[in-house]
Amino acid sequence: MKRVLLLIFCVMAYARPVCQEVPVLCYHNIFTGNSYTPGPLRISADQLDQQFRSLAENGYHSISPDELLAWIQGRKQLPPKPVMITFDDSHATHYTLAAPILARYGFKAVFFVMTVTIGKQGYLSSAQIKALSDKGHVIGCHTWDHQPLASGNINWQQQLTKPKAVLEKITGRPVNYFAYPYGEWNMAAIEEIKAHGFLAAFQLSNAQSSQEPIFTIRRMIVAGNWSGTRLLSKIEETFPPK
């Protein structure tokens, strides 16, 4: 009887099957010139522009976490070829370089901020975070100092309560979405994230949890040396149509 009730609850809570996913892209630092070598966590502004141009020219539409959550729960239809664009780790270049490129193609993104870096050299300031939010982008939480939440002995007030409050004060808006540092999660972390009022959480490439799909949404790290064409093929490979 308990198993039947659980199945009914899952059907009501998640109208989409766990295996049906929307592409979610994950970026980190952005640079100009020859200051860095492109890699899994670094991409040049020119290459980012090329990738976004390929998405736009091939009919992709950026969506927000609110739209994704409503779709998962069966409350909303998504536009053709939806994609979510996310940036981790609070780099100042998210504002100075990524935001203008996003605007060029009419895209919106999610910026997952670790609050220990706010205002430090090379990282987003409070004013920049507010400006991104005011432009229609979503500000999400990425803990206080990027501590992996599956490691045990976590100070949840420091890693969840305070960062959420800080970001909500800066933006004047609810902070409803979370990204796990290093993509690492366990059920204890999920329970804490839910208890702190987050509506969904994003990991990296590990398998989604069948019990908690909304709190283990997969993302693909986009390599800095991928061409636009390569990005399109990787999207189809990682998030195949169902």
Give names to the regions the model predicted:
Residues 21-26, 31-135, 166:
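Active-site beta->alpha N-cap acidic-glycine motif
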Residues 23-25, 63, 85-87, 109-111, ...:
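Hydrophobic faces of well-ordered beta-strands that scaffold small-molecule active sites
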Residues 4-13:
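Sec-dependent N-terminal signal peptides
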Residues 95, 124-138, 144-174, 184-195, ...:
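Alpha-helical scaffold elements lining the catalytic groove of polysaccharide deacetylases
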Residues 29-33, 69-70, 89-93, 116-120, ...:
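Solvent-exposed loop/turn segments at secondary-structure junctions
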Residues 43-77, 168, 194-214, 219-225, ...:
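C-terminal domain-boundary segment and adjacent tail
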Residues 13-20:
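Boundary at the C-terminal end of the N-terminal hydrophobic targeting segment
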Residues 105-108, 135-139, 194-201:
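Glycine-enriched alpha-helix->loop->beta-strand junction motifs that scaffold or abut catalytic
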